[in-house]
């Protein structure tokens, strides 16, 4: 899958990121997502999102999908995730929709915060990353956006929307959720 400059900002990001299609199949993820779940990226692509959630959390994940279909986004949704070794961790899911040039929903960009890792150091790292990513997206908008094809513009717009949403998350408050 071709990676635009906008998507490259997520490659080794400190946050877990995945892109899914409109039926919940994982189309892409970053190394942080794969590593935290204990898989190779190639083992994740093409799998349904439910493979990374224990059965007792399927209803919560289903509710999250329902909210996403109805509103185009999901914010602060606590869901338990399952690693390949069977261990679990509480995560906080944030998702924004991706649309094509005709405003048809293609899928979502999803960021998951591992709530067990919400230290002051990690929060500082996230804030720095969000700031740098927003700056990079601003550069792309200014210098490259007009030359992008429709698919790349759609990807850029989806990522910009995601980072705009993430910049409103109170990361310090996440330390208290578990």
Regions inferred by a protein language model and the residue ranges of each:
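PAS/LOV and related PAS-like sensory modules
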Residues: 1-22, 122-149, 155-168
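PAS/PAS-like sensory domains
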Residues: 15, 67-78
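PAS-family sensory domains
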Residues: 20, 80-86, 93-96, 99, 104-115
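Conserved hydrophobic beta-strand signature of PAS-family and PAS-like sensory domains
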Residues: 26-27
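PAS/PAS-like sensory domain cap-loop motif
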Residues: 33-44, 55, 102
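PAS/Per-ARNT-Sim sensory domains
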Residues: 55-66, 77
């Amino acid at each position: 899958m071709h990676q635009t400059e906008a998507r490259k900002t997520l490659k080794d990001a400190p946050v877990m990121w995945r892109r899914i299609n409109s039926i919940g199949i994982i189309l892409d993820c970053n190394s942080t997502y794969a590593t935290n779940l204990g898989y190779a990226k190639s083992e994740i692509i093409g799998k349904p999102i439910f493979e990374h959630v224990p059965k007792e959390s399927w209803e919560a994940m289903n509710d999250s999908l329902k909210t996403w279909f109805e509103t185009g986004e999901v914010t602060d949704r606590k869901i338990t995730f399952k690693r390949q070794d069977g261990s679990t961790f509480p995560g906080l899911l944030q998702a924004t929709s991706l649309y094509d040039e005709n405003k048809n929903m293609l899928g979502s960009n999803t960021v998951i915060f591992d709530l067990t890792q919400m230290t002051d150091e990690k929060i500082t790292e996230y804030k720095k990353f969000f700031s740098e990513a927003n700056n990079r997206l601003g550069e792309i908008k200014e210098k490259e956006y007009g030359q992008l094809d429709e698919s790349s513009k759609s990807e850029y717009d989806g990522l910009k929307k995601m980072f705009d949403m993430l910049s409103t998350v109170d990361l310090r408050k996440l330390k208290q959720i578990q």
